[in-house]
Amino acid sequence: NSIHDMDREKLFEKFLEDCKNRKEWCGQGNPNADILIIGQESTDISEEALIRNIMLCRDKKDRDAPRPIDPKNKTWANYQELLDEIYCRKSEYIDKWDFEKFAFTTELSSTPRKQRNYKEAKPSIKERIVFFKDSDFIQDFSVIILACGGYIKNDDKVREIDNTFHVEFCKEYGSKESKNRFWTHIDKKDPRKLVIHTRQFSNGISKDLIKEMASVIREHLRKLGLI
C-alpha cells in the first residue's frame, strides 16, 4: 500500500540515516504500518537515547514489541485506546501496550520540553517540519495524526499543515468551545492520504474525541481496502 515506488523499508532506512546525521529522534513502532502518529516531543533525547533509538528501530524484532504499561504515560495509554478503537480490537496483553504493531510514532520537536521552553525550541521545530516535508518515509503513510497541538498549524496567514503534507483542509470535528477538536485534511490529487490535526494526547483527551477520530480513520482505511 505504498504510495511511492520504493519499498517502505528502504524509505525507513533513509529516514533513520537522516535522523542519525541530524542527531534527531526517529521514533518507534511499526514503520510498515498504515498509521503515523506525530506527537510534540520525546521525554529523553540525550545523545545516548538517540543512538539507542536508532538501534532499536533497526531491530525488526524489537521495534514493535509490546511495552510494559507505565501508568504515568497518559500519551501512550491514549494511543493504545485510539488504535484499539480503529481496529475494533482488544490487546492480548493485560500488563503491556501493543499499539505499536499498528502505528509508527515520532515527535515534531527534537528538544525535550523539560530542557527548554517552546520559544527556544521553535527554530528546531520549524527545521523538523521541513525535514518531514522532504521525507518520503513520513509522506508515505495512509493516515498521519498530528497530535501536537500548536506546534504546527493552519490559519489565515500560515498553512503549515497543507504545505508540509501536500493536503487541503477538509472538515472540523467537535464544537468550537471544546478543547477536544480535530481537523481532517486530504490530498485531493491522491486521496489515499488522510492527515488529522489535534491536540497533544498527554492529558485532557475525551473518550468521545478518541471514538470519533477512530471512526473517521477506520472509514478511510476501509475505503482503501486496508482493513
Q: PLM ranges: what are they?
A:
Residues 95-113:
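Short, contiguous, well-structured surface segments enriched in hydrophobic/aromatic residues
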Residues 37, 145, 195-197:
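Structural motif
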Residues 65-96:
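Acidic, metal/cofactor-coordinating or nucleic-acid-engaging core segments within structured domains
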Residues 61-75, 109-126, 200:
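Surface-exposed cleft-lining segments at the edges of enzyme active sites
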